[in-house]
Amino acid sequence: MQLLAIGINHTTAPVSLRERVAFPLEQIKPALGALRSHLSGRSGTEAAILSTCNRTEIYCATDVLTPGTDGFEHTLRWLSQHHNVPAGELAPHLYALPQSEAVRHAFRVASGLDSMVLGETQILGQLKDAVRTAGEAGSLGTYLNQLFQRTFAVAKEVRGQTEIGAHSVSMAAAAVRLAQRIFESVSTQRVLFIGAGEMIELCATHFAAQQPRQIVVANRTVERGEKLAEQLSGQGLTANAIRLTDLGERLHEFDIVVSCTASSLPIIGLGAVERAVKRRKHRPIMMVDLAVPRDVEPEVARLDDVFLYTVDDLGAIVREGNAMRQAAVAQAEAIIESRVQNFMHWLETRSVVPVIRELQTSGEAIRQAELERARRMLARGDDPEAVLEALSGALTRKFLHGPTHALNHTQGEDREALLRLVPGLFRHSSHSER
């Protein structure tokens, strides 16, 4: 069984490409079924899909994906067809990691070493959600289950034994820093949050600490927006919720807009922002789009009075704190390397299980056949001593037939290898078992 991780992330592809191969949550289960069917349709193929604002990754365990074969191309072709993105456009940004490289990558991702925000913890929760979804879809098996359980254990070990999360500048904190660079004081600004998920909650908490003049939460289901607004109001702020459909009429009221929804299409168009800017009499408006796919049409960035930032734009601010954690990175990498070797040892032992089962099945078939023959001999009155002699002789000949035949018909290096191997296979204790 071969392991494979294929994907793109914030270091290999811009957000304009990442958003085109992102998987909305409701599409992941059917996508897993389609992927497994595409990979030769074998029921033994295991798969999981991780899709976040910074990465889209596919993890597979199958016997048809091996380096140097069409396996990598199969998965690339499926990803290309599923998202209607030309393979030639996607391939230069894709990484394909087999076996130990896939294991190492999974460990690094879960530990926050591969994140834009070095050491961030949100990715671990996202990976756990991806594994849970794959489990519900029935696409996990022995190999990926073991990989991810060890992945979660390694992430816990890394965070517990290193300071990888220290001095971390989160995306939410970076958004606040940007606002402080544009506006003299966040406390005099009106802030709109679009969405009510985990990322928006984190951003709202950071902005709330700056005591803005007003906070409004716009969400498709107003109840969720109201719940977040209530949490923020408890911090002595003026916060309320509106429906997403009210955006067009209310957008001009806000100086800062932070958006992160799961929409597959932009929810703020160029025309809506142009009208808002006009009604604001060209006072500047800052927009932070943390969604992938993007919530704000990219053409909005061309407007003179709009400062539009995406997740990629926030990367420079985030990286300012990364250099301070390089010692922790070295410690984390050492832990991960050790755990990769442990997992690969487990994987290698798993590879012999089918062979052992086949040997056991073959041996049992021989035993049953010779036992039945011995019973027939006893039933017709043959001497028991002769029957036992015949039984033991037949078992010995049949068990040794395979190795003997191989030794007689193998040549060159293969024969030399067998000559070294066979004696060890048939070595037995000098003390008979009783």
Curated annotation (Swiss-Prot):
Q: Which residues bind substrate?
A: T52, C53, N54, R55, S115, E120, T121, Q122, Q126
Q: Which residues bind NADP(+)?
A: G195, A196, G197, E198, M199, I200
Q: Name the domain of life this protein comes from.
A: Bacteria
Could you say which residues are annotated as the site Important for activity?
Answer: H105
Reactions that this protein is recorded to catalyse: (S)-4-amino-5-oxopentanoate + tRNA(Glu) + NADP(+) = L-glutamyl-tRNA(Glu) + NADPH + H(+)
UniProt GO BP: protoporphyrinogen IX biosynthetic process from glutamate
Its annotated pathway reads: Porphyrin-containing compound metabolism; protoporphyrin-IX biosynthesis; 5-aminolevulinate from L-glutamyl-tRNA(Glu): step 1/2
Q: Active site located where? A: C53
Task: List the PROSITE patterns.
Answer: GLUTR
Q: What is known of its domains?
A: Possesses an unusual extended V-shaped dimeric structure with each monomer consisting of three distinct domains arranged along a curved 'spinal' alpha-helix. The N-terminal catalytic domain specifically recognizes the glutamate moiety of the substrate. The second domain is the NADPH-binding domain, and the third C-terminal domain is responsible for dimerization.
NCBIfam families cross-referenced by the UniProt entry? hemA
Q: How does it assemble?
A: Homodimer.
Instruction: Give the protein's function.
Output: Catalyzes the NADPH-dependent reduction of glutamyl-tRNA(Glu) to glutamate 1-semialdehyde (GSA).
What protein does this entry describe? Glutamyl-tRNA reductase
Species source reads Cupriavidus necator (strain ATCC 17699 / DSM 428 / KCTC 22496 / NCIMB 10442 / H16 / Stanier 337)
Q: What is the lineage of its organism?
A: Bacteria, Pseudomonadati, Pseudomonadota, Betaproteobacteria, Burkholderiales
